[in-house]
Swiss-Prot record:
Listed HAMAP family: ATP_synth_gamma_bact
Family: Belongs to the ATPase gamma chain family.
Alphabetical UniProt keywords: ATP synthesis, Cell inner membrane, Cell membrane, CF(1), Hydrogen ion transport, Ion transport, Membrane, Transport
Subunit structure: F-type ATPases have 2 components, CF(1) - the catalytic core - and CF(0) - the membrane proton channel. CF(1) has five subunits: alpha(3), beta(3), gamma(1), delta(1), epsilon(1). CF(0) has three main subunits: a, b and c.
Disulfide bonding pattern of the chain: none
Localization (cell): Cell inner membrane
Gene name per UniProt: atpG
Species of origin: Solibacter usitatus (strain Ellin6076)
GO MF term set: ATP binding; proton-transporting ATP synthase activity, rotational mechanism
PANTHER family on file: ATP SYNTHASE GAMMA CHAIN, ATP SYNTHASE SUBUNIT GAMMA, MITOCHONDRIAL
Protein name as annotated: ATP synthase gamma chain
Pfam families cross-referenced by the UniProt entry: ATP-synt
Membrane topology: Peripheral membrane protein
GO cellular component term, pick one: plasma membrane
Length: 286
């Protein structure tokens, strides 16, 4: 049976841990609020860009020159670029583990193809480095402050590889932010690009040929998909960490209560034992 000193030391240790998890929860909540605002603010731009692109696509539906855009070229998927967006830190529940499992499952399902990785986030990078997979590029620290320029550079590199036919498809693996308690694991193909369809396309009057407009908008659309994915992932990571730290704080409180109850029982048993010894000694003296 542990002594009272050992139990008190254990309670003190759990309380210290509880303070850390509570502080991390508060920090994650503040970061989540900012990341959530940026994610929600970016969604209307992405929606409008898809709408405009859909209208342009309708205008060039019968234009053969538009169909020649290299970002629309469909080929047999023999060489695939898999962009995996994980977090830079742990203590976020199953956030990083689920992403890594999804990427590994994708590789297993495409065992006949050549998979090259683009790794965004320290956790994914560290995991796949040990597996000695083919890596096209790495990026660490982007989620701390998501910038369009950083994600656009990665998107441009992927588009360049696709245009040069060094790869046949580009897939993104990330967590889409739904709510504080819900993040959706998402696997989406961004290249070859698929033009959005408009149910009721607007008949715009274009100053430039629609095919030229398509050539301008399509790369922006791909860049926006990368940017949106990283924004969604950053918000999801903070939400997952906040939830995990809230759960850890609650578990610590329960453990402290149980240890305190156990300590009181041990102390009561010790006092009872001492009383019995005193009474027994007095009885023996008589």
């Amino acid at each position: 049976m542990p002594s009272l000193i050992d139990i008190r030391r254990r309670i003190r240790s759990v309380k210290n841990t509880q303070q850390i998890t509570k502080a991390m929860k508060m920090v994650s909540a503040a970061k989540l609020r900012r990341a959530q605002d940026r994610t929600i603010a970016a969604r209307p731009y992405g929606t409008l860009l898809r709408k405009v692109l859909g209208n342009v696509a309708a205008a060039v539906a019968n234009d053969e020159s538009a169909a020649e855009n290299p970002l629309l070229a469909r080929r047999e998927e023999r060489r695939i670029l898999l962009v995996v967006i994980t977090g830079d830190k742990g203590l976020a529940g199953a956030f990083n583990t689920n992403l890594i499992k999804a990427a590994s499952r994708f590789v297993a399902e495409h065992s006949g193809e050549q998979i090259t990785f683009e790794l965004i986030g320290r956790k994914g990078r560290d995991y796949f480095r040990k597996r000695e997979v083919a890596v096209s590029g790495e990026a660490i620290g982007l989620a701390a402050k998501v910038k369009y320029e950083d994600t656009a550079a990665i998107a441009r590199r992927a588009m360049e590889l696709f245009r040069n036919q060094e790869i046949d498809a580009v897939y993104l693996v990330y967590n889409e932010f739904k709510s504080v308690v819900s993040q959706k694991l998402t696997l989406s193909r961004v290249l070859p690009a698929e033009l959005p369809e408009q149910a009721n396309p607007v008949d715009y009057i274009f100053e430039e040929p629609p095919a030229d407009m398509l050539n301008i908008l399509l790369p922006k659309y791909v860049e926006m998909e990368f940017y949106r994915a990283l924004l969604e992932s950053a918000a999801s990571e903070h939400a997952a960490r906040m939830t995990a730290m809230d759960s850890a704080t609650s578990n610590a409180a329960e453990m402290i209560d149980k240890l305190t109850l156990y300590m009181n029982r041990v102390r009561q048993a010790s006092i009872t034992k001492e009383i019995i010894e005193v009474v027994s000694g007095a009885a023996a003296a008589e």
